Amino acid sequence: MSTKTTIHINGVTELQGYIGGTVLARLLEHPKATSFRITALLRDPVKAEKLKSFGVEPIVGSLDDVEVIEKAASDADIVIATADCDHQPSCHAILRGLKKRFEATGKRSAFINTSGTGALSDNAQGMFASDVIYDDANPTQLEALPLTNMHRAVDTAIIAVDAAGYISSYLVLPSTIWGWADHALVRAGIANHRSLQMPIVISASLLRGHPGVWGKGASVWPCVEIGELGELYVLLLDAVLEDPSKVPHGKEGYFFGAADEFTWYEASRVVGEAMVKLGKAKDAEPTSFTKEEIEKYLSGYDLSSNARCKATHSCALGWQPKKMKADFLASLHREVEGCIEKPFPLKSRVL
């Protein structure tokens, strides 16, 4: 039997490969990488062959291939899910596989699942900034989140299996992720290098010829740079490998990927300034997206909410993000240029 730690990861290619590719690249560079056996689920057989050259064992399949996913999870000491955080069939397949592993070995595998700060959303529709700040070290506050909120159906299902004693679960909630990923998997053409949220807002603004916001753009969201988010996953993994008894899990196992916060007006104003400089708008001042534009270009009112939070648990792992709001805003000119060069798929799920 292998003495290596088997880590199974999904979401390393296509749009979801922005997070998953970054995490996988970090694992491949990890000081203990030779002690890992890494398997990865992906749909593209060509990219699967490329992954082999990195020492990763590809498993060709999609999130709908639940039997494949269940088997991969049943063979894993640790599962890291970074694909579609609302895809219930694949999540339940992972949970079934990890339960089978527990029943066969008596050992609780670790499940690091990617959720999102969209779970914290209110119904502000861009009209006000909330004074509610969620803390990842306050399980009572987080348990009170409505089950109808984004991601809660999957999050609570995972927590329930942890409570039953079959797994140790850890929920990572990234916020607005920014920056262009630059690592070996991107350069090999395997992983996606671009975020989802801002390119969608920017592309919608370019199509209307003017920077846009939901409502007044007053709502507040957190943000995190992609490389620093990848570091959070690795710090969490390291803590679990070193001594899982010291790491909060289950209903207490939330870890926010949030370094700073911004208003959507602030972001859209900077987008507008870039559009003016690039000849794509005459005025940098954002205006409200119309109902028709929201239905045509965007995924509804997902980004019109407040989702304020404090990353207490994440920082307790030793996570010390350095890139803040000013860096995020400064990155948007490049994003506008990127969206002009290659328009982004609209109406994508962005939280």
PLM regions and their residue ranges:
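N-terminal Rossmann NAD(P)H-binding glycine-rich loop of SDR-like oxidoreductase domains
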Residues: 2-33
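NAD(P)H-binding glycine-rich loop region in Rossmannoid oxidoreductase-like domains
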Residues: 40-105
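Glycine-/Pro-rich loop/turn segments that contact NAD(P) or position catalytic residues
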Residues: 85-89, 96-197
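Glycine/proline-rich active-site loop of Rossmann-fold NAD(P)-dependent oxidoreductases
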Residues: 180-199, 236-254
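A conserved pocket-lining segment of Rossmann-fold NAD(P)-dependent short-chain dehydrogenase/reductase
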Residues: 199-227, 232-235, 247
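Mid/C-terminal beta-alpha module of Rossmann-like enzyme folds, strongest
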Residues: 210-211, 239-298, 345-351
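Conserved C-terminal active-site "lid" loop/helix of NAD(P)H-dependent oxidoreductases
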Residues: 291-321
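Amphipathic terminal alpha-helices
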Residues: 325-351
